[in-house]
């Protein structure tokens, strides 16, 4: 038996029946759950019930099977007063009131009342004091319990009834109900109108005292699933004082926790089934163990944030975790959140803006110095700079950011995807580069624009079975355009099988284009130049000078100086920096002084200047200044390549121009492994749009959930160059997302452009065009007016559909009647002519005529005015252009005697 102290001090009264003692204990939860005993009262045999009074001197009452009631003091443990009944019989239940009264319920006796009330102070001074009141009935009492903060007493009688007694009067029933649930009465501390009691076989009922005079007093019955009628049952009910509606039950060596919630009833007079079980969890006890008591436990009574169930298992304490019930919630396609708690629904809009397109995206520049990001575009450098320049000053500030649901939902990737779609984020790579705010995605789309233009213009020429289009530096340098994994990279690194052939092809491309691309290392120079060209780094000297001048005009002198350094124009670095601001002029003086004093051939000598330059390379924030001083300090390009704040594109250009062959191969392998694993999308400049690039994109999705960008990028090469199941999954996920948002037009454009991109170098479309989802069928023969590419589709058609808008392709001559049954086609309600003629578009099989694809699409757009259109309300039809012209000035249907009003006006 276990009861928590009413003083809320974390202590418990524990009846140890095997030792005939009662202990006043606390629970020591760490490092191991154990008792911490404060007081022990011994020689208390056959204790059947206990209760405590929470006054200044906490008093414990213990009733025994002989009827004796022992009064024990926590403040004075040596004190003990024993109240002896006139006739020996079990004391079944005790209850202390707020007004210092003690009520005891006894088993039935022929000669003495079974319900007695004493004044507590009188008993403490004289245990033989007579009761203030006693019941006139002689029925046995199984359970007694006071309603919180009231003089009303609830009693359960062995005559199978529950009574409400006003203790300000005689102990006679004010109201009562006949029920089999009369044992172990406990009152809900949060809702005193509710109380729980159990029957002999262990079923539990929840009562509402407000309906005792009606037939609706029973709220819910909780059946006991562990009934063992032949075995004696140890039963206990405990309400939690920390969370409303939590009821713990001990029955047949099994512990059950239920979360009870009240229903909302429109009619207050009807209370049937007004309580329901929202959550239930069972805590089984091992068969060879015995649980002798339960109660609720929390490590801190002042801040009860973590409530547990305390059970006495084999006389030792054991804690059972109490997990809150799962709160149902759901997101809609627009990232709004709604959740339910109890009987209410709580919607949370993702932002206070009208649309997600108005949501300001999460701006990393609030936390990172702006100059660092202006000159750095790699994903890895962003992470580095964020962690380097920022730290959370306090847990409170971090907590506030995490709890701002507007910001969390508004900057969620789903909101970002929706915002991009509305702005036209599709297959125009140049436009995509302008739409995205992330600098590394800007560079990525710029490279895809370059690669797509090179592929469309056949810039690399006819190279036979070797295709350099959409290739990155890795595939070109290792002379393997079909890299699928890192193992292929390592194999290609050692292979020399196609070296002569690829070098010859690369030399032919460079000579044909007449390009003068700078590389400091002359070995495999055509291959280096081709890799630089494919990565968008193939600037000639004239292009380099133009780019440097453009940067100087934009006052980006440091970036211009870095660009000159990366192209071997070391003498121009000082001149460019000297034309900048005061700080840049000072830095140019330092660089010039070192170059003048040491000379280019002595960069590696130890000197004070070298040490200062090395320190500056780690302390400066601008990545280009860091790179300049990293090179000046040691004249070693490896130090510059270790500068992670530089964009991957810049580091790749340095490696291709200045590293020897073996060092370049090793560096590209290491860089590839890092970028693929991290999912850095700028790494596609290295891997290209290859199966290995698809692996990088998969890791990018795993890190960002940006399936939109991955699906768009993959469409440039899948299925035109190779098949990839991952890319197909991304595409279908993105299409499904657009459909959920009901952006059917954008999804249709996505499908159309994907089909156009799937055209290979021979003009063949490798992707099957998406079938239209709307058909116009004849209302008489139920066959499609426009022929299908697959004639068998005509056999399984739905019921006649006459309302809708057809978007079929260009048609052959149809005339004014159905091509199948000859019935006349509907007439235009504006012009009166038939809706079918030779200009009405129908579906055609473009996969058979790929060379006419763009021409036919443009033809469809020009003929849109002659397409079928029908009112969804009245069913009258018209040519699309005629309907548009009519309803631009009218609101009523043009058919006489039809009063259908346009819903869009």
UniProtKB/Swiss-Prot annotation:
Presence of the UniProt keyword Transcription in the record: no
Residue numbers carrying Phosphoserine: 394, 397
InterPro entries: MIOS/Sea4, MIOS_a-sol, WD40/YVTN_repeat-like_dom_sf, WD40_repeat_dom_sf, WD40_rpt, Zn_ribbon_mio
Entry-linked SUPFAM superfamilies: WD40 repeat-like
Gene Ontology molecular function: ubiquitin protein ligase activity; zinc ion binding
Keywords assigned: Phosphoprotein, Repeat, WD repeat
Membrane-crossing segments per the record: none
One of the protein's GO biological processes: positive regulation of TORC1 signaling
One cellular-component annotation, GO: GATOR2 complex
Keyword Cytoplasm: no
CDD domains, alphabetized: mRING-H2-C3H3C2_Mio (cd16691)
WD repeats: 42-82, 86-128, 136-175, 177-217
Family, similarity comment: Belongs to the WD repeat mio family.
Record's protein name: Uncharacterized WD repeat-containing protein C12G12.01c
């Amino acid at each position: 038996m276990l009861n928590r102290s009413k003083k809320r001090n974390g202590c418990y009264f524990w009846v140890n029946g095997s030792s005939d003692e009662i202990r006043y204990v606390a629970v020591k939860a760490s490092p191991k759950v154990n008792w911490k005993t404060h007081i022990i009262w011994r020689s208390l045999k056959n204790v059947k019930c206990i209760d405590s009074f929470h006054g200044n001197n906490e008093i414990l009452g213990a009733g025994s099977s002989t009827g004796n009631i022992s009064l024990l003091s926590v403040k004075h443990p040596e004190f003990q007063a024993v109240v002896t009944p006139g006739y020996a019989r079990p004391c079944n239940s005790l209850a202390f009131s707020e007004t210092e009264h003690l009520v005891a319920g006894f088993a039935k006796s022929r000669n003495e009342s079974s319900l007695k009330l004493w004044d507590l102070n009188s008993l403490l001074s004289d245990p033989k004091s007579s009761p203030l009141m006693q019941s006139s009935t002689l029925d046995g009492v199984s359970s007694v319990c006071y309603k919180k903060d009231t003089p009303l007493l609830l009693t359960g009688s062995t005559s199978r009834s529950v009574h409400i007694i006003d203790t300000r009067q005689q102990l006679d029933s004010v109201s009562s109900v006949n029920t089999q649930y009369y044992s172990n009465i406990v009152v809900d501390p949060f809702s005193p109108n509710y109380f729980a009691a159990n029957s002999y076989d262990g079923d539990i009922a929840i009562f509402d005292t407000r309906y005792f005079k009606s037939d609706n007093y029973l709220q819910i019955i909780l059946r006991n699933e562990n009934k063992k009628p032949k075995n004696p049952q140890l039963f206990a009910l405990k309400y939690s004082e920390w969370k409303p509606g939590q009821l713990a039950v001990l029955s047949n060596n099994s512990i059950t926790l239920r979360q009870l919630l009240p229903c909302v009833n429109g009619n207050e007079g009807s209370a049937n089934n007004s309580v329901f079980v929202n959550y239930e969890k069972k805590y089984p006890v091992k068969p060879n163990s015995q649980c002798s008591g339960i109660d609720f436990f929390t490590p801190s009574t002042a801040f009860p944030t973590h409530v547990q169930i305390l059970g006495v298992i084999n006389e030792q304490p054991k804690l059972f975790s109490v997990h809150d019930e799962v709160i149902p919630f759901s997101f809609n396609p627009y990232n709004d959140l709604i959740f339910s708690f109890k009987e209410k629904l709580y919607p949370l809009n993702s932002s206070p803006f009208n649309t997600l397109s108005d949501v300001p995206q999460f701006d990393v520049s609030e936390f990172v110095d702006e100059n660092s990001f202006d000159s750095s575009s790699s994903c890895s450098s962003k992470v580095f700079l964020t962690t380097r320049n920022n730290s959370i000053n306090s847990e409170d500030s971090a907590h506030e950011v995490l709890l701002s649901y507007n910001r969390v939902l508004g900057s969620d990737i789903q909101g970002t995807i929706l915002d991009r779609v509305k702005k036209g984020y599709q297959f125009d790579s140049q436009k995509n580069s302008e739409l995205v705010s992330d600098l590394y995605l800007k560079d990525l789309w710029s490279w895809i624009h370059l690669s797509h233009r090179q592929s469309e213009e056949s810039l690399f020429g006819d190279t036979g079975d070797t295709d350099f289009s959409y290739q990155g530096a890795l595939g070109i340098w290792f002379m393997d355009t079909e890299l699928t994994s890192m193992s292929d990279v390592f194999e290609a690194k050692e292979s020399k099988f196609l070296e002569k052939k690829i070098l010859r092809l690369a030399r032919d491309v460079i000579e044909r284009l007449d390009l003068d691309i700078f590389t400091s290392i002359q070995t495999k120079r055509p291959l280096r130049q081709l890799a630089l060209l494919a990565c968008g780094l193939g600037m000639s000297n004239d292009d380099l000078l133009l780019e440097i001048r453009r940067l100087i005009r934009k006052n980006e002198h440091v970036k211009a100086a870095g660009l000159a350094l990366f192209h071997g124009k070391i003498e121009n670095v000082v001149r460019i920096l000297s034309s900048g601001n005061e700080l840049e002029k000072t830095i140019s003086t330092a660089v010039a002084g070192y170059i003048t004093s040491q000379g280019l051939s002595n960069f590696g000598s130890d000197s004070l200047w070298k040490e200062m330059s090395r320190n500056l390379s780690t302390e400066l924030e601008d990545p280009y200044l860091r790179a300049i001083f990293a090179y000046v300090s040691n004249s070693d390009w490896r130090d510059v390549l270790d500068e992670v704040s530089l964009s991957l594109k810049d580091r790749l250009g340095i490696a291709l121009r200045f590293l020897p062959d073996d060092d370049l191969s090793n560096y590209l392998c290491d860089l590839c492994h890092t970028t693929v694993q991290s999912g850095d999308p700028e790494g596609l400049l290295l891997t290209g749009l290859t199966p290995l690039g698809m692996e990088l994109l998969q890791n990018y999705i795993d890190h960002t959930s940006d399936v939109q960008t991955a699906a768009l990028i993959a469409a440039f090469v899948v299925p035109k160059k190779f098949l990839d199941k991952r890319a197909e999954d991304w595409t279908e996920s993105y299409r499904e997302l657009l459909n959920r948002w009901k952006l059917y037009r954008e999804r249709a454009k996505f499908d159309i452009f994907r089909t156009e991109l799937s055209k290979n170098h021979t003009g063949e479309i490798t992707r099957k065009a998406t079938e239209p989802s709307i058909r116009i069928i004849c209302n008489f023969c139920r066959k499609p007016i426009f022929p299908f590419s697959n004639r068998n589709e005509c056999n399984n058609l739905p019921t006649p559909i006459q309302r809708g808008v057809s978007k079929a392709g260009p048609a052959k001559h149809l005339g004014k009647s159905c091509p199948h049954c000859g019935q006349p086609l509907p007439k235009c309600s504006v012009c009166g002519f038939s809706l079918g003629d030779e200009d009405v578009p129908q579906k055609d099989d473009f996969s058979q005529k790929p060379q006419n694809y763009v021409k036919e699409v443009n033809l469809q757009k020009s003929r849109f005015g002659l397409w079928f259109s029908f009112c969804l309300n009245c069913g009258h039809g018209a040519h699309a252009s005629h309907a548009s012209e009519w309803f631009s000035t009218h609101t009523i249907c043009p058919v006489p005697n039809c009063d259908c009003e346009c819903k869009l006006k």
